[in-house]
């Protein structure tokens, strides 16, 4: 049975995230959001023209581990009221990646000047949302301990293609001892909207990762001898897949720099 929400606890989180979003909106904060406001849901963001939105929606539905869909918004809608008070997707993410013809052309802190009335926003679940549950269970998260971004890798695991959208899964990695890994599986399997259980454990070469010390995105972390790598689906997958499609323009969050919502992580169960 899910524990009742402590209203004072939630109110404290909401005050914290309101202040944090103000600093993000002003451009003062542009770091990774991993570990920030633990207890609240973080979301990967994809923004693309309406003409491509239906196929991308189907892609998310066919690939729920890599692209767990929290919400999709009407064309032109930039205030994401279902995710929180006064959330403006054009300004409230630390950094955005802008892609033109499948190529990342710039990184921005504010995309208000690029906004189009036909843009459709997708909010996808993020593994940062279950980090709090892991910590509550006594598990140490390597990248948080080293104050760095999570390690993310492109794999050889194919997604289920839809229309022009095709490519391989991107994963995030956190090292644990075997016993801790079992506990992490049990915990994260309760959060399907935050990528759920790991898709692979151990032997990175089996999923096409040649070097853990050279992540495709994010930062590398030290892996102790008694630890094994544990891999979860990752919301950077859409960046790779949509880039492969070479559509004229799309925008995403920068890897590791998410939209922090007003929703409690327990609401993702």
UniProtKB/Swiss-Prot annotation:
PANTHER family reported for this sequence: D-GLUTAMATE CYCLASE, MITOCHONDRIAL
Annotated protein name in UniProt: Putative hydro-lyase Swoo_1731
Species: Shewanella woodyi (strain ATCC 51908 / MS32)
The organism's taxonomic lineage, starting at the top: Bacteria, Pseudomonadati, Pseudomonadota, Gammaproteobacteria, Alteromonadales
MF term (GO), any: lyase activity
Family according to the record: Belongs to the D-glutamate cyclase family.
Classification via InterPro entries: D-Glu_cyclase (IPR009906), Putative_hydro-lyase (IPR038021), UPF0317 (IPR016938)
Keywords of the record: Lyase
EC number: 4.2.1.-
Intrachain disulfide bonds: none
């Amino acid at each position: 049975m899910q524990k009742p929400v402590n209203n004072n606890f939630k109110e404290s989180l909401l005050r914290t995230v309101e202040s944090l979003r103000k600093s993000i909106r002003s451009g003062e904060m542009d770091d990774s959001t991993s570990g920030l406001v633990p207890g609240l849901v973080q979301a990967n963001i994809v923004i693309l023209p309406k003409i491509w939105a239906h196929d991308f929606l189907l892609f998310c539905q066919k690939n729920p581990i890599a692209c767990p869909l929290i919400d999709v918004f009407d064309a032109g809608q930039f205030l994401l009221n279902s995710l929180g008070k006064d959330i403006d997707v054009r300004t409230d993410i630390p950094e955005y990646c802008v892609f033109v013809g499948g190529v990342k052309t710039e990184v921005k802190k504010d995309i208000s000047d690029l906004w189009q009335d036909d843009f459709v926003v997708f909010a996808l679940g993020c593994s940062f949302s279950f980090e709090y549950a892991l910590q509550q269970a006594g598990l140490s998260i390597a990248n948080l301990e080293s104050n760095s971004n999570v390690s993310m890798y492109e794999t050889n695991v194919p997604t289920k293609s839809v229309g022009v959208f095709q490519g391989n899964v991107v994963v995030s990695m956190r090292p644990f001892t075997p016993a801790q890994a079992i506990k992490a599986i049990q915990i994260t399997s309760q959060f399907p909207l935050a990528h759920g259980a790991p898709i692979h454990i151990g032997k990175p070469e089996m999923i096409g990762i040649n070097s853990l010390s050279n992540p495709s995105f994010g930062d590398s972390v030290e892996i102790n001898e008694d630890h094994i790598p544990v891999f979860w689906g990752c919301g950077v997958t859409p960046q790779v897949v949509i880039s492969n499609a070479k559509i004229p323009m799309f925008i995403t969050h920068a890897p590791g720099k998410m939209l922090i919502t007003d929703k409690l992580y327990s609401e993702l169960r």
